[in-house]
């Protein structure tokens, strides 16, 4: 069969008739889409570059790391408030990837015989992170934003769906498999990624007097997570699926994967108060912070490892989570900021959708306040904002594409509180 000689892009493989433009050179071609992609990567300061000598991709490990201040500034663009948590995360993430750079340099020096076996080196420990904060306070968003900034693979898991190996449900190796998939099965890239495990508080031991029956999703899962955090070699089936006898498995070392775990830890405030206040005796003592988000946040800031052990986390797991960052409960003002200020703010997203229909979407100040107030009432934090806006605009988004004269859509407090239709002009 004759070889197809139709010119095609050397980068994406698209043929000349599949793109708007194809720029040809002697030995290579590039299409307009790849040019646009490269331009975007340069403008965004993408940290992946290609080595000109051997064509291998060099990650940010060979480049200058963003400083904690630069990491914090990037987080500020997407996450409102949570200043203490952002600072703690920025330092922890910076130190973690600095540790990987040191390890990579050490390995290279040994490879080139620059270091002998007896040369003393300070071994840097991994700083895994525990995030404590109410639902919808930004724990997941912080982890996702960090991974996106560093351009590393990211995988997320819900601790409540995990079981011990051998039981029905997801085991810890499934999380590593998700990370490997996010890295397009590039093992080296996956081993530099970030894993976020949410709802870690839901797998706490139910008390000091544990039942002798098998704890499928409690302490056993904590022990399995401990192996992942400490560093283990996970055997992953190629391209997903189940393990089979005589199957060649992909070996992934988790020693250098940054593990972030988070949870709301409802009831932890009582444990802390019992320790810090002499007037609070036992779990039935009145907790003043119950309806006071600010006071609850202040209590969380006083958390100690012993409180987490009493809550139900095993000591070995807590010992592997040296960085503890607490997030505050978001108030109405913060929720209003979240609606409009971040780079990917919910209001901006819907305004863009309406622009595509040649209509301008706007929210009154009272309308924004009503959205934030409703989210506060639902106790869903920032997580509940989108559903409120979606419900308010559902009928309008259904009708708008069929309307030729709609140029302006206004959402006020009546739309949110009374279910009235947005004003269309």
UniProtKB/Swiss-Prot annotation:
Q: Which of this chain's residues are annotated to bind Zn(2+)?
A: 9, 12, 31, 34
UniProt key word Metal-binding: yes
Q: State where ATP binds.
A: 134-141
UniProt-listed SMART domains: AAA, ClpB_D2-small, zf-C4_ClpX
One Pfam family from the record? AAA_2
Q: Which GO terms describe its cellular component?
A: HslUV protease complex
Q: Which residues cross the membrane?
A: none
- GO terms of molecular function: ATP binding; ATP hydrolysis activity; ATP-dependent protein folding chaperone; protein dimerization activity; unfolded protein binding; zinc ion binding
- Extract the HAMAP family matched here: ClpX
Tell me, in a sentence or two, what this protein's role is: ATP-dependent specificity component of the Clp protease. It directs the protease to specific substrates. Can perform chaperone functions in the absence of ClpP.
The name this protein goes by in its record: ATP-dependent Clp protease ATP-binding subunit ClpX
């Amino acid at each position: 069969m004759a070889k197809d000689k139709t010119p095609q892009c050397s980068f994406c493989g698209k043929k000349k008739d599949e793109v708007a433009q194809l720029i040809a050179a002697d030995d290579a071609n590039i299409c307009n889409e790849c040019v646009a992609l490269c331009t975007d990567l340069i403008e965004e300061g993408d940290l992946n570059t290609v080595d000109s000598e051997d064509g291998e991709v060099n990650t940010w490990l060979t480049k200058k790391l963003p400083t904690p201040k630069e990491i914090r500034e990037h987080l500020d663009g997407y996450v409102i408030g949570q200043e203490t948590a952002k600072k703690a995360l920025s330092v922890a993430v910076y130190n973690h990837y600095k540790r990987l750079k040191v390890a990579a340099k050490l390995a290279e020096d040994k490879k080139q015989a620059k270091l002998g076996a007896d040369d003393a080196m300070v071994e840097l420990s991994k700083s895994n992170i525990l995030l404590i904060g109410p639902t919808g306070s930004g724990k997941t968003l912080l982890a996702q934003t960090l991974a996106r900034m560093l351009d590393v693979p990211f995988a997320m898991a819900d601790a409540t769906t995990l079981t011990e190996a051998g039981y029905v449900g997801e085991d810890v190796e499934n999380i590593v498999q998700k990370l490997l998939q996010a890295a397009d099965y590039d093992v080296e890239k996956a081993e530099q990624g970030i894993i976020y495990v949410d709802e870690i508080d839901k797998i706490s031991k139910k008390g000091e007097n544990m039942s002798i029956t098998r704890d499928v999703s409690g302490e056993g899962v904590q022990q399995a997570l401990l192996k992942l955090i400490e560093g283990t070699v996970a055997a992953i089936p190629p391209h997903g699926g189940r393990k089979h006898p005589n199957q060649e498995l992909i070996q992934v070392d988790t020693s250098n994967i940054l593990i972030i775990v988070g949870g709301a830890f409802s009831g932890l405030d009582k444990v802390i108060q019992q320790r810090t206040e002499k007037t609070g005796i036992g779990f039935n003592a009145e907790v003043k912070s119950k309806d006071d988000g600010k006071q609850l946040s202040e209590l969380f800031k006083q958390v100690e490892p012993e409180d987490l052990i009493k809550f139900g986390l095993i000591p070995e797991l807590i010992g592997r989570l040296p960085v503890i960052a607490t997030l505050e409960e978001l108030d109405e003002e913060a929720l209003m900021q979240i609606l409009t200020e971040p780079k990917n703010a919910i209001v901006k997203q819907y305004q863009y959708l309406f622009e595509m229909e040649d209509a301008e979407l706007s929210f009154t100040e009272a309308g924004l306040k009503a959205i934030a107030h409703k989210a506060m009432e639902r106790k869903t934090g920032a997580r509940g904002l989108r559903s409120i806006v979606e419900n308010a605009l559902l009928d309008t988004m259904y009708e708008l594409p069929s309307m030729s004269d709609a140029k302006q859509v206004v959402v006020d407090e009546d739309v949110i509180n009374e279910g009235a239709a947005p004003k269309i002009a």
